[in-house]
Design a protein with these regions (language model features):
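A structural "domain/chain start" motif
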Residues: 305-349, 439-444
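Lipolytic serine-hydrolase domain surface
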Residues: 226-311
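Bacterial N-terminal signal peptides
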Residues: 15-27
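Serine-dependent carboxylesterase/thioesterase catalytic core
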Residues: 171-253
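A conserved cap/lid and substrate-binding interface adjacent to the catalytic center
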Residues: 70-188, 206-213, 236
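C-terminal/domain-edge helix-coil "capping" segments
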Residues: 310-315, 386-390, 400-444
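N-terminal secretory signal peptides that target proteins for export/translocation
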Residues: 1-9
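Surface-exposed short loop/turn segments
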Residues: 360-415
Length: 444
């Protein structure tokens, strides 16, 4: 998809530019039990970094759940650097920020990917970064992929802005972190975006940001630099790289004999979907992150990272146990679909009561009245294998909304294919597409 909306505007308005790197957020301490939440958050923000329909959908969802999502784009002759910042204040006053970069989206990004030569990496200011990379007598310095370095320099370390005191955005970010040593910055991305997040963290480290403030989580990251780069920066930042089993891109640069090596904590995921999907796509990483989260976090309500302020109904919503009619290949997805649907409704509406049992319509309406609910939502999820597309499915969501005395308010059916999104996320997409109709039926 063409990114004209980003290319045509070099920056957001001045006020947004000022806010972009005014982080002022407290560190989010992460226990071992919270790692699935952080991985899912990183996957969400990485997905939102893309400008396709899926990315725009995730951005809308993040904003609905009280995330502030801002974007900026800076074009140079070498690259079109794009960066996004997601921020949220938690209930206890802590705030979290995630800096993300998109993967390959346009022709200029492809040129960046194919710029395979290695350039020297060093310096303690943007001017020095540029000078060192342009130098030739630097055998003792670390070296990095030229295209990835071009992308990061364009995004954060090229243009000095009056709004940042004639500093680059990257310098403003580094200074903000150094002034507030209690702060933590998460950096994330997929593919090209993964490489950019690591190079950015290394640049911030060279600007004096200490390791405890830099946490990098990547998906399908190619190698970025040589052995010297790996050994130097493995102690200057926290780096977790999540790799899908059989993802060909994660190892492609090592196979080219350019001296690029991987480092950091490696976590290998094996895709559990039975759909026929390319193992490098961000949608598959997001799908696995969601599954790991559902497996690890067994609660009645979503984690506070994924909650916002629900819309208050004039009378509660009684949600019938979902009806699922899925082909055998998607049967294993049923618990995840049910959990995702539950959380999506719980986040959007209040009060809600969820039924766990089936029954007749009469018993359903009676249960809703007994629970003090004015509305009843009935959802049916179904899918069929597409013969013309191996491993792909046609999914349908049917929604009925009634009053608790049995009066039908809304009946709607929506369908999509599992082309761009796996089944779980595709059903969530259908739910989101029906939000306006559902809201209207519920009197919102």
């Amino acid at each position: 998809m063409e990114r004209k909306n980003f290319a045509e505007r070099r920056f957001l308005p001045v006020v947004s530019a000022l806010l972009f790197f005014c982080l002022a957020f407290l560190p989010l301490s992460v226990s071992a039990q919270e790692e699935p939440e952080i991985d899912l958050l990183a996957a969400l923000v990485s997905s939102a970094s893309y400008s396709d329909d899926g990315g725009l959908l995730v951005r809308s969802w993040l904003k609905e759940t009280a995330w502030d999502f801002q974007s900026r784009s800076t074009s140079t002759r070498a690259a079109e650097g794009r960066v996004h910042l997601a921020r949220k204040t938690l209930a206890d006053g802590r705030r979290i920020a995630v800096l993300s970069f998109p993967g390959t989206e346009n022709k200029k990004d492809i040129e960046v990917d194919l710029r395979l030569s290695a350039v020297p990496f060093g310096g303690t200011s943007p001017a020095e970064f540029t000078a060192v990379a342009a130098g030739s007598d630097a055998a003792d310095l670390p070296h990095v992929h030229k295209g990835f370095n071009d992308f990061v320099m364009a995004a954060l370390f090229t243009e000095e802005m009056p709004e940042f005191g004639n500093r680059t955005a990257g310098e403003a970010l580094a200074d903000e972190l150094k002034e507030h040593p209690e702060e933590v910055l998460y950096l994330t991305g997929h593919s090209l975006g993964a490489a950019a997040s690591l190079v950015t963290a290394a640049r911030l480290a060279d600007l004096g940001v200490p390791p405890e403030q830099l946490h990098v989580i990547t998906f399908g990251a190619p190698a970025v630099g040589d052995e010297k780069f790996a050994r130097l920066y493995e102690t200057k930042l926290h780096f977790t790289r999540i790799v899908m089993k059989a993802d060909p891109v994660a190892a492609v640069l090592q196979s080219l004999g350019k001296g690029f090596v991987q480092f950091g904590e490696k976590i290998v995921w094996k895709p559990r979907t039975r759909e026929d999907r390319f193992h490098h796509e961000m949608a598959l990483y997001f799908d696995e992150a969601l599954r790991y989260y559902c497996d690890a976090v067994q609660t009645d309500s979503p984690h506070e990272l994924f909650c916002g302020t629900p819309q208050e109904l004039a009378g509660g919503l009684y949600v019938a146990a979902p009806s699922l009619d899925l082909p055998e290949a998607l049967a294993q997805d049923a618990p995840y679909i049910e959990r995702a649907v539950h959380d999506a409704l719980d986040v959007r509406y209040a009060p809600t009561v969820f039924s766990t049992q089936g029954g007749t319509q009469e018993s359903l309406f009676a249960a809703a009245r007994a629970a003090g609910c004015k509305y009843v939502l009935v959802e049916h999820f179904s899918g069929n294998l597409l013969r013309e597309r191996h491993g792909s499915f046609r999914l349908t969501l049917e929604e009925e909304i009634y009053t608790s005395d049995g009066r039908l308010l809304s009946l709607e059916s929506r369908s999509t294919n599992t082309g761009d999104l796996p089944a779980i996320e595709a059903f969530l997409y259908l739910m989101y597409k029906g939000s306006e109709t559902r809201d209207a039926a519920l009197g919102l």
